[in-house]
């Protein structure tokens, strides 16, 4: 499911995504009759960082603090926690990526790397009744992973500083697990965790919502 201009949806529509993103199902009650429907999907949402769209460009944004706060308040903590990855991309970064073409992988090379990773993933999860790492429960994740002391310290520091929540911690571990599989490693290393954390960039949102409290 691809939702463009995510912030243009009504708050109640955004919040209604919480159950299907968490459980892979949706419950509907009509005329006293209860129905549960499957709703296991991958959600990709895009949005501008502020109403004018230039919130990540230094000196260009025309929005006031209150306009930004009102705009971003639709993104509740529980909704953010249900995204595995939150990426910010400024125009400067996008232009740089367009230029950096030399030495990049071809589509066929990327496809082969992904297929190899999927095979490793299936082998790893064969005893967990999961199709992929994203479907691992908190209990299954803890049983599967044996984190080093250094990895645990990295997560603890991030949690204590308020950078991540408990649910967000599971998301980071799942992304780190995928990175581990892509690099054909047998355990999650600190560098895998640090990379996974860079793919969970909610700083610009928290900065606006928490400023001036």
Question: Where are the predicted features?
Answer:
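Walker B catalytic acidic pair
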Residues: 4-5, 16
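Catalytic or ion-coupling anion/metal-binding cores of large enzyme and transporter domains
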Residues: 8
């Amino acid at each position: 499911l691809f939702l463009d201009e995510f912030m243009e949806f009504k708050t109640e529509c955004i919040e209604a995504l919480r159950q299907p993103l968490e459980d892979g199902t949706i419950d509907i009650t009509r005329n006293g009759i209860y129905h549960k429907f499957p709703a296991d999907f991958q959600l990709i949402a895009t949005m501008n960082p502020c109403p004018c769209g230039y919130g990540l460009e230094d000196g260009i944004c025309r929005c006031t603090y209150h306009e930004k706060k009102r705009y971003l308040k639709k993104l509740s903590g529980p909704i953010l926690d249900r995204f595995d990855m939150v990426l910010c991309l400024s125009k400067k970064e996008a232009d740089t990526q367009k230029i950096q073409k030399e030495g990049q992988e071809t589509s066929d090379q990327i496809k082969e790397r992904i297929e190899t990773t999927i095979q490793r993933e299936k082998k790893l999860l064969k005893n967990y009744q999961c199709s992929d790492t994203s479907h691992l429960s908190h209990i299954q994740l803890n049983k599967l992973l044996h984190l080093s002391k250094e990895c645990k310290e990295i997560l603890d520091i991030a949690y204590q500083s308020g950078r991540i929540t408990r649910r967000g911690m599971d998301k980071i571990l799942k992304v780190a697990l995928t990175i581990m599989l892509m690099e054909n490693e047998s355990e999650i290393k600190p560098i895998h965790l640090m990379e996974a954390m860079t793919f969970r960039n909610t700083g610009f949102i928290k900065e606006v919502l928490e400023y001036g409290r």
